[in-house]
């Protein structure tokens, strides 16, 4: 029993010394060798290397636990197979080995999954390891492979364009279609009326635009026709403008006739008086504008004819005078009678015409050339005047058509006049009635004051005496 107690005490001392020895080795070894027992793991590589060392068993464990062991000492190896202290030592070694193995496996799993936490060493500095460490072949392969860059998106820039007018026209057309469809669903007769009215307004608007453009051309022709200078005369441009304006007037006359036909159709299919009167008034206004424009055009053509006549008289005056050679010929006697300083120059410049028989020939040739030019000019002016006369005749035909249209609308105009006269009479009668009522009210004012005074008197009487 005593020997067993001694052995138990020595075993406890050996166990405490071995545990402190292993802790000191862990502190000296650092992160490279790893820790055994209760020390923290220095790194996953050290743990893996340490896990490969088999744990001491049996006799080796007893030798490793002894602290006072030296190389020369002889230690008796007792049998711990049945001793409870030997079993405790083996269990402790097995527990330490299993703890190291579990920590090693957890570190390896963290390395594989990429969730390895930072490892605390003796200097208490945190280290973070990558989730996966590439090999050398993978590293060089990643360098050799070119990196695929995503293509930059192409930016398409569209030119700006103002299409507000087109948008407004599209909306108007859609609105007109919707109105027509709605009216078609409800009443086909009203749909026809709306369609005819829209057609009438479209034609009237087109005629108004054409009249405005023709007025602009007429103003330009007026500016050109009123010029009286011979050098700033542009007959070709005037003729072109005259021809264009004449065609525009004919086209406008035809368009107004079409508009009048549309208004007649409206009268047949429409019972409303206001719509009929509106359409007839618009036709009459457009006809009056066309008539005034035709009158202005006729006056401009008359002004142009007057200017042409004046230019012709001026040209005739200058062409009937002495010829240019006759006016500028200098006889040798007059040259000699001139200045003595210019005598040499006159002698050098003067040309001897030879005999006097050649001078009449030259004068007749120049006169014939002048006459030919004047004849061409007169022919051009005659053609211009003929064109003007034909245009005036066509304008007379347009006036006749306008007069016929006005004659057709005479009844409507008379109705408008009678309605205006009736309205004026009614307004005058209403004014007279209002004056009569005002006079009657002004006469009865004193009566109203008397009645009001009597009421106040009775009120005061009852209030004073009844109270």
Swiss-Prot record:
Q: Where is the composition biased (Gly residues)?
A: 29-45
Polar residues bias: where? Answer: 68-77
Q: Which UniProt keywords apply?
A: Coiled coil, ER-Golgi transport, Golgi apparatus, Membrane, Transmembrane, Transmembrane helix, Transport
Q: Which residues form the signal peptide?
A: none
Q: Which domain of life is it from?
A: Eukaryota
Region listing for Disordered, in residue ranges:
1-53, 58-77, 310-335
Coiled coil location: 245-269
How does this chain sit within the bilayer? Single-pass type IV membrane protein
The record ties this protein, via InterPro entries, to:
SNARE, Syntaxin, Syntaxin/epimorphin_CS, T_SNARE_dom
This molecule's function is given as: Mediates endoplasmic reticulum to Golgi transport.
Q: Any idea what this protein is called?
A: Syntaxin-5
For this protein's source organism, the top of the classification is: Eukaryota, Metazoa, Ecdysozoa, Arthropoda, Hexapoda
